[in-house]
């Protein structure tokens, strides 16, 4: 199987897209606070402190997909890159040295994030509804969030150097789909996420700015709302891999994302 590194080096802004999928989207999955209405009706009404994201819609994009490797024609199809050009629909993603795939990390962390967001009062929409499909493509992963209040795209990096470690967060500059105000909000959200992850004892990757601003990631380029892409760690680094594979690590990442969203979006 050909594996493509999810991320790129800090000095390689024109490398392949990290966020990804397929030319044949499997649709989006929506989930929100209505699913728990029966249970909550028997207890006290949530306060603003209990549900700081009440009334907001958060789009979550678990990068790649488990079926991408089985459909190279789909994931290699050219799609708009959001900057006037085209690029491949997606890549397969990376994996740890013991074979834990990035797409599974992204999916499992998305599940933890969905739960944490709903506990904070948000409605959650997902760019894919399983981890065994193909797609959607990177342009659709950004565009599906048009009716949301923010987009978080989940990834993990695949630098070949096993000594590379730590997370980095990416925002995009203003462009075809996001004006200057939205781009500024994206960078603000990215900065808040850096701080929140550090508060959860995650170490930033010293090779990258905190946050990174890049114009070559099509998922971010197609977002019309504040959007960030998280590379949560280096999957080929043994310590990072152990953390990313653990439910504790995934839940702490989810908690940090919620904290960042609350800081920036708390209505």
Predicted regions, residues:
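Intrinsic disorder/low-complexity detector
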Residues: 13-16, 36, 70-73, 92, ...
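A generic signature of intrinsically disordered, low-complexity regions enriched in glycine/proline
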Residues: 16-18, 38, 65, 94, ...
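Active-site histidine-acidic residue metal-binding/catalytic motifs
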Residues: 46-141
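Sec-dependent bacterial lipoprotein signal peptides
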Residues: 1-4
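A generic alpha-helix propensity feature with a strong bias for hydrophobic helices
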Residues: 16, 28, 36, 49, ...
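N-terminal low-complexity, Pro/Thr-rich disordered segments
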Residues: 6-57
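Active-site-proximal helix/loop segments of hydrolytic enzymes
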Residues: 7, 100-267
